[in-house]
Each structure stands twice: as structure tokens, then as C-alpha cells.
């Protein structure tokens, strides 16, 4: 009989590096066939956090051989001009993925912008058609953060079939697609949110917990079944200004079988899965 180990760290940095190496190899194979995967990244305005995210995405492209086209516009850019630029990128065969960094200035409708991106180039997986493909199990693009979470869960060796998974959060970008991906893996899924009466009641029964609400300490040790897999999507700051997640890491790691840290867990995986989606978009053009 094996004894249960607690607090095993799921290393997102190591897994990300492994997956990026695989992307680089597949990019070389595509280039040998005359196709270089191309990702267009559009930044509108001066949001400092967005600028950092975009820099990281462009660097990740450079590191793996993906061609990145970075377009930066003033915050005064009109909605019509942005939509026209997206239409031009949709028609450009050298561009396989299009990403508009959010948030965008208030005079531009984000829904219109996301919907303007061709479903074949929607590597963020946010558009309504992409969400429909995910819902029906069609082979579309999976949103990068939930896709990365699934890869992290895979590393634990847990067979999700019949397991109880609880997702805390119901956002269109993480919570809802996360629940769908877990369903596709044959888990029994419960989604908790701000109107859930007793989140702990549900999480204490869970074999897998994904916390994705953007609120510190939403999951504490008393809410976790011993040996559970805990994935922390949150990105917050503690009282000392240090990065922390939605999970009380120090407490929960004493109970959980596996847990992702913040930073170094889900974060690195999000950009990696963006590269994977862009690569797959390019591969589809030569199949």
C-alpha cells in the first residue's frame, strides 16, 4: 500500500519549457514545408500590465520560431479602424493567429473586436463560434488558460473519468471553458461562484479544484479533501505586495496531493498554450 504524499508542487515553469521545446520542433518541421506560423498581437493604448503581457508573448514567439507581428496603436484609435485592421489580418495568409490584448479603450466594443477575428485565427478561443466549438466538442481552439490547466492536471497522473471536479469561478475566459474541458475528460463537474451558498460543501467532496475568481484566500485548507489536486488560476497581491493566487497556498499544500504555486504555476502555461494554438492553426493550413 502506497502512502499518500501531500503538497507535491505542479511546476508550470518546467512543463511550459517542455511544451515550448515541442512547439519549436514542430515549427521547424512546418518551416521545412514552407510555412512559418505567424501571430499578430495588437495593443491599443498605454495599459502598463498589457504592455508587459504583450512583451512576454512576443518573446515567447521569438524563442520558439513563431513569427510575431506586433502592432501598437494610440488609445485614440477608432473602433472602425481597429476592425478594418483585423479584417486585413484575417485575409493575410501569413498570419495564423490574431490576438487583441485586453483591456481596450472604453470607446471600442470588446465583443465586436473579438467577434471580428476569424474563427480559424481565434487563438485565444474567446469568440462565440470558438465557444460553440468547445461546447459541442468540435476541434476548435481551447482558451489558453483552461487549456494550460488541463495540461497541468495531466502531469499528476490522475484519471479524471468519474472524478469530482469543482471550478470556482464562471468567467467566459476561464471558469466556463474550464468546466467544459473537465466534462470532456469525463469528470463530474460542479461550478461554484459568488452566489453559491457554501463553496466549502462542494470543494470538500472534490478530487480536483480549480480556483479562478481573482480573490485571495477563496480556498483554505479546511475546504480541501486530503489528496485533492488544486489548480490556482488567481493572480493577486498580498499585504506585502507579493504575487499570490486565490488559494491559501501555505495552508492548502499541507492537505492537497498536488498544488500549483503562484507565481510559477498556471501563468507560464497560458502563453505556452497560445503558442500551441498558433502552431496548430498553421498546421491546419498544410493538412
Swiss-Prot record:
CDD domains in alphabetical order: NAD_bind_m-THF_DH_Cyclohyd
Entries under InterPro entries matching the protein: Aminoacid_DH-like_N_sf, NAD(P)-bd_dom_sf, THF_DH/CycHdrlase, THF_DH/CycHdrlase_cat_dom, THF_DH/CycHdrlase_CS, THF_DH/CycHdrlase_NAD-bd_dom
Catalytic activity: (6R)-5,10-methylene-5,6,7,8-tetrahydrofolate + NADP(+) = (6R)-5,10-methenyltetrahydrofolate + NADPH; (6R)-5,10-methenyltetrahydrofolate + H2O = (6R)-10-formyltetrahydrofolate + H(+)
EC number(s) stated in the UniProt entry for this protein: 1.5.1.5, 3.5.4.9
Highest taxon of the lineage: Bacteria
Keywords: Amino-acid biosynthesis, Histidine biosynthesis, Hydrolase, Methionine biosynthesis, Multifunctional enzyme, NADP, One-carbon metabolism, Oxidoreductase, Purine biosynthesis
Binding site for NADP(+): 169-171, 194
Protein family according to the UniProt entry: Belongs to the tetrahydrofolate dehydrogenase/cyclohydrolase family.
Name listed for the protein in its UniProt record: Bifunctional protein FolD
Record organism: Albidiferax ferrireducens (strain ATCC BAA-621 / DSM 15236 / T118) (Rhodoferax ferrireducens)
Amino acid at each position: 500500500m502506497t502512502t499518500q504524499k501531500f503538497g507535491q508542487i505542479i511546476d508550470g515553469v518546467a512543463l511550459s519549457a517542455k511544451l515550448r521545446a515541442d512547439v519549436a520542433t514542430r515549427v521547424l518541421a512546418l518551416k521545412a514545408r514552407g510555412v512559418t506560423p505567424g501571430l499578430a498581437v495588437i495593443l491599443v493604448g498605454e495599459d502598463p500590465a498589457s504592455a508587459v503581457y504583450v512583451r512576454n508573448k512576443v518573446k515567447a514567439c521569438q524563442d520558439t520560431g513563431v513569427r510575431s507581428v506586433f502592432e501598437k496603436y494610440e488609445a485614440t484609435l477608432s473602433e472602425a479602424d481597429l476592425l478594418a485592421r483585423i479584417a486585413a489580418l484575417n485575409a493575410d495568409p501569413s498570419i495564423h493567429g490574431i490576438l487583441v490584448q485586453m483591456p481596450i479603450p472604453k470607446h471600442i466594443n470588446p465583443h465586436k473586436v473579438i467577434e471580428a477575428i476569424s474563427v480559424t485565427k481565434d487563438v485565444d478561443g474567446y469568440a462565440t463560434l470558438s465557444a460553440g466549438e468547445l461546447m459541442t466538442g468540435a476541434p476548435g481552439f481551447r482558451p489558453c488558460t483552461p487549456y494550460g490547466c488541463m495540461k497541468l492536471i495531466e502531469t499528476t497522473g490522475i484519471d479524471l473519468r468519474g472524478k469530482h471536479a469543482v471550478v470556482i469561478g464562471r468567467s467566459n475566459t476561464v471558469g466556463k471553458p474550464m468546466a467544459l474541458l473537465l466534462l470532456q475528460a469525463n469528470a463530474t463537474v460542479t461550478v461554484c461562484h459568488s452566489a453559491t451558498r457554501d463553496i466549502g460543501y462542494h470543494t470538500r467532496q472534490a478530487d480536483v479544484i480549480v480556483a479562478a475568481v481573482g480573490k485571495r484566500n477563496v480556498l483554505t485548507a479546511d475546504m480541501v479533501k486530503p489528496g485533492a489536486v488544486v489548480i490556482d488560476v488567481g493572480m493577486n497581491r498580498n499585504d506585502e505586495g507579493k504575487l499570490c493566487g486565490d488559494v491559501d497556498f501555505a495552508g492548502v499544500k499541507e492537505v492537497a496531493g498536488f498544488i500549483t504555486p503562484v507565481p510559477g504555476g498556471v501563468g507560464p502555461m497560458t502563453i505556452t498554450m497560445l503558442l500551441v494554438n498558433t502552431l496548430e492553426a498553421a498546421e491546419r493550413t498544410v493538412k
